Amino acid sequence: MLPQNKDQVLPQTSVLPGCPPWGFSQLVDSSPHNLQPLSAHQSLRPSHPPFFSTQSHHPSFSPPASPSPGFQFGSCDPNSDFVPHPCSPSLPSSPTFFHQNYLSLPNPRASSPSNHWLYPSPPLTPSFSPSQPQNSSLPHSPCQSPSHPEDLHSSTLTSPGPSPPSQRLHSNRQTWRWHQYRDTGSGSPGVVERCVPSEKDPAQFRDPGALAQALVVQLGHRRIAHDLRLLLLQHLWLGRTGQAPVVEYPICLVCLRPRSPSCPLPKYRTGPRLLAFPQLLPCVEGQESGPLRIGIGFGLRLPQGQARALHLLPEKRPKEVGPQGKDPQACGHPSPAFQPPAAQARADPAPGTPSQTRSFRSAGLQSPNSPRCFSGPPPRAPKQATTSPKPRPCPAPKRPVSLELILQKSSV
């Protein structure tokens, strides 16, 4: 509590222009343990004007003309405490706060002899003067933020401290927005460009390389090289030597630009992406050894249906058909499952004549008198060789044997 006599706080002598002004450290008790927040419900008496007010470069406030719990650091009421709040959430961010803010007395009447400017001392060092006794009877108050909005206005501008965390979070949020939406190519952070359809249809390229080059121009070679360099250094730092560094950029095939929140949703689950990867360049012709050169290769990752719709895949060749558009097996050619009569005869051989059965098989296909069980031209030797997976060479008979002789021997 302040003494009852006002002369102990501020003498009634006017300050001459040549005399040094009073310091801020002589008016406020600098002990941080003896500080107590100023109550917002306490006001000054109408007969006394406020002691002095502040003018900061952060908020612009005018000194109150009527008694109000505004920016008042002292009062003449003996029931009020002349102590600002030690830890306010609206602290200045600059440590040179006392060099940028000045304290001034209100000027209601020019005839008042005590109206003069007060400049606070830059260092806030603990000092005690005989004009102000040490306030040791005040209870210790914890450093906490005011619970009412009125306390916020009545407890500001105390001592230099660190910048509030709200300003740092706001700056980080702007940086995060800029990194998030910088893919759109906008000049200002946080501004998202609209998805404007491109003048050229992606289906007109008909080449994945040409479409990839058009997307690279919109994205920028310098940015791709920077991102790929960072990814390569990250792989080397983490020891991922087995994985090739590949940078993927989601793209929009409507505006032919990197994808932004304003672009329409892709039709497929995996949207189109532009791939960038390091590529080893060949040496110069005529030089066996030289410096290692690394380039950047590009590719597109598209769903198969979307790539086929954009005519980026080679067309499939139609299957070869016969002259009349029919299956070759319908013309009377034997199929692999078809067995000629010689094969049927081999399936049921005579009990004692295996060699005669083999000769019958070889002679049955070569003799002109053998019966035919299918219509159409006779099968050719090369085509029959293609139908059987592994044709066995038949042993040539030592002498020509007629069909009648073979039948007579088999019946005995």
From Swiss-Prot:
Source organism superkingdom: Eukaryota
Matching Pfam families: DUF4679
Biased composition (Low complexity): 126-142, 334-350
InterPro entries per UniProt: DUF4679
Region annotation Disordered: where it falls in the sequence: 33-75, 123-174, 318-412
Sequence intervals crossing the membrane: none
Annotated Polar residues bias: 33-45, 353-372
PANTHER family: PROLINE-RICH PROTEIN 30
Protein name stated in the entry: Proline-rich protein 30
Organism: Macaca fascicularis
